[in-house]
Structures are given as structure tokens and as C-alpha cells.
């Protein structure tokens, strides 16, 4: 008998995941450049735990909705450019 074709990547579930990934990334990119430093450090510390990622994105979306016209405070919101809480635990190799 012939084997049933396996499901190929790129079906509906994966596409939704890809769109969700880009929505989350755009939200983080926008908000991480505009939030106050304390909040950014808290979120960066929370992002070290994979279980808290959705909570961080949700809080970032709420912050973005409440502060629509917030000014840009920094060029980048990454941990490397903004060392702080929990940054000493990791060694970043570039």
C-alpha cells in the first residue's frame, strides 16, 4: 500500500504561528524603544523565562494602547544594548 502523504510545513497552524510571531515582534520592537527603563528591565528579566513571554507581550500591547504617542527613548530594546536585571547571568557571544 502507498503511504499517506505527511503534512507539509506551511499549513494553517504554522501560518498563524508565523503571523503571531511577526505581530509579537512588531509590538516588542515598537514598545521596547519607548517604555521607561524600569519597565524595560522588568520585561527583559521576564523574557528569560519562556512561560512569561505571552504575559510580556500582553503587557506591552496594553502599554502601547495606553501610550499611543510615546516618544522614542532609545534606538534598541535588546538586552545587549540595555544591560540590567539578570544580564549578568548570561554570557553573550557575538
UniProtKB/Swiss-Prot annotation:
Q: Look up and give the organism this protein is from.
A: Maedi visna virus (strain KV1772) (MVV)
Domain of life, per lineage: Viruses
- Output the Pfam families linked to this UniProt entry: Lentiviral_Tat (PF02998)
List UniProt keywords, sorted A-Z: Cell cycle, Host nucleus, Virion
Q: What is this protein called?
A: Probable Vpr-like protein
Functionally, this protein is described as follows:
Seems to function as a Vpr-like protein, since it mediates host cell cycle arrest in G2 phase. Cell cycle arrest creates a favorable environment for maximizing viral expression and production.
User: Has keyword Cell cycle?
Assistant: yes
Q: What is its main location?
A: virion
Localization, per the record, is: Virion; Host nucleus
Recorded GO cellular component terms are: host cell nucleus; virion component
Amino acid at each position: 500500500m502507498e503511504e499517506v502523504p505527511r503534512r507539509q510545513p506551511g499549513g494553517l497552524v504554522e501560518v498563524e504561528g508565523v503571523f503571531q510571531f511577526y505581530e509579537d515582534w512588531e509590538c516588542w520592537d515598537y514598545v521596547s524603544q519607548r517604555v521607561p527603563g524600569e519597565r524595560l528591565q522588568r520585561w527583559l528579566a521576564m523574557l528569560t523565562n519562556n512561560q512569561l513571554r505571552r504575559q510580556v507581550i500582553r503587557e506591552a500591547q496594553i502599554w502601547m494602547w495606553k501610550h499611543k504617542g510615546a516618544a522614542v527613548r532609545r534606538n534598541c530594546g535588546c538586552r545587549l544594548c540595555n544591560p540590567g536585571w539578570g544580564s549578568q547571568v548570561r554570557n553573550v557571544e557575538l
